[in-house]
C-alpha cells in the first residue's frame, strides 16, 4: 500500500491540498493510498489521517510564534521521528508553511525519502537566500505561478509548474446573483433575505489574527452601519475552521 505523508500548516494549505488528494484518489494505481500527517478538515474529508492538530502551526507574527515555539519544535521532532521509523512514507509532501516544512523535508531527504513541496516560498519577493536550504531539502518544488520555475532552473532545483489548485473554482466573470443564491442556500435563507449591500468580512484564518484584529473589523462594521443608514447591509464572515466560530461569536 503506497504511503504519502503531508503537512499543511494552516487553513489556506488545507484548502490548497484537498484538490490534490482528491485527484490522487481518482487514479486507479493509487487505490489504497494511505495519507497521513498534519492537515485540516478538507484534507481529512479526502481520506487523510491527521495525527497532530493543524492549529498548533497556525500562528501569526513574531510574538505569537515565540510563544508557540516550544510546542512547534516538539511537534516537529515527534513528526520527524515518526516519519523516519514506524510511519516512514514513500513520499513526503509539504504544503506551504516553509519555516516548518523545510526543516522536516531536509531530515527526510537525508534519510532517502523523496520530498515534494507545494507552493514555493516567495523567494522572488524577499529572503532570496532561502533557495540554498530549499535546494538541500526539496527534491522537486511544485510551483503555482509560471514564472517561479525559471528561478529554480537557474538555481539547479527541480521544479514543475502545476497551476493554482483553486483556479478552476473561481470564475473569471463572477455571477453575483448566482453567488447570492448559493449563500442563501448554504445559510438556509430566503432569496429575498440578501437584498441590499452584501459585505464580506475576512478577519483571518488564525486564532491569533482574529484575537488581534477582529475588534477593529467589528468597529468598522458598526461605523458602516451608522454611515450608510437607510441602506440594507448584510455582513458575512466566513469561518476557516469550526474552532474559530466561537471566538468570532463572542
What are these regions (language model features)?
Residues 53, 190-193, 244:
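Short, solvent-exposed coil/turn linker segments
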Residues 94, 199, 236-238:
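Short beta-strand segments at enzyme active-site cores
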Residues 16, 206-238:
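Conserved catalytic-core segment of nucleotide-activated headgroup transferases in glycan assembly
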Residues 19, 23, 216-219, 247:
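Long, highly charged amphipathic alpha-helices
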Residues 2-3, 191-200, 233-234:
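Charged active-site motifs of nucleotide-sugar-dependent glycosyltransferases
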Residues 233-250:
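Catalytic donor nucleotide-activated moiety binding site of glycosyltransferases and closely related
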Residues 2-187, 202-210, 223:
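Active-site and donor-binding regions of nucleotide-sugar-utilizing enzymes
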Amino acid at each position: 500500500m503506497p504511503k504519502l505523508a503531508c503537512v499543511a500548516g494552516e487553513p489556506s494549505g488545507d484548502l490548497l491540498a484537498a484538490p490534490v488528494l482528491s485527484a490522487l484518489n481518482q487514479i486507479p494505481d493509487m487505490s489504497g493510498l494511505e495519507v497521513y500527517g498534519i492537515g485540516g478538515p478538507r484534507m481529512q474529508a479526502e481520506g487523510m489521517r491527521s495525527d497532530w492538530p493543524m492549529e498548533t502551526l497556525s500562528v501569526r507574527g513574531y510574538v505569537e510564534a515565540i510563544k508557540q515555539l516550544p510546542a512547534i519544535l516538539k511537534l516537529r521532532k515527534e513528526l520527524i521521528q515518526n516519519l523516519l521509523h514506524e510511519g516512514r512514507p514513500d513520499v513526503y509532501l509539504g504544503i506551504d508553511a516553509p519555516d516548518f516544512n523545510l526543516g522536516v523535508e531536509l531530515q527526510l531527504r537525508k534519510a532517502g525519502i523523496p520530498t515534494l513541496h507545494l507552493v514555493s516560498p516567495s523567494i522572488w519577493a524577499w529572503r532570496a537566500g532561502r533557495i540554498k536550504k530549499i535546494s538541500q531539502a526539496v527534491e522537486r518544488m511544485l510551483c503555482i505561478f509560471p514564472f517561479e520555475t525559471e528561478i529554480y532552473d537557474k538555481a539547479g532545483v527541480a521544479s514543475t509548474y502545476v497551476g493554482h489548485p483553486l483556479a478552476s473554482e473561481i470564475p473569471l466573470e463572477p455571477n453575483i446573483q448566482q453567488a447570492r443564491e448559493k449563500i442563501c442556500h448554504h445559510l438556509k435563507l430566503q432569496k429575498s433575505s440578501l437584498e441590499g449591500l452584501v459585505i464580506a468580512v475576512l478577519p483571518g484564518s488564525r486564532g491569533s489574527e482574529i484575537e488581534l484584529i477582529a475588534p477593529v473589523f467589528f468597529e468598522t462594521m458598526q461605523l458602516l452601519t451608522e454611515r450608510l443608514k437607510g441602506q440594507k447591509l448584510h455582513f458575512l464572515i466566513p469561518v476557516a475552521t469550526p474552532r474559530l466560530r466561537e471566538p468570532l461569536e463572542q
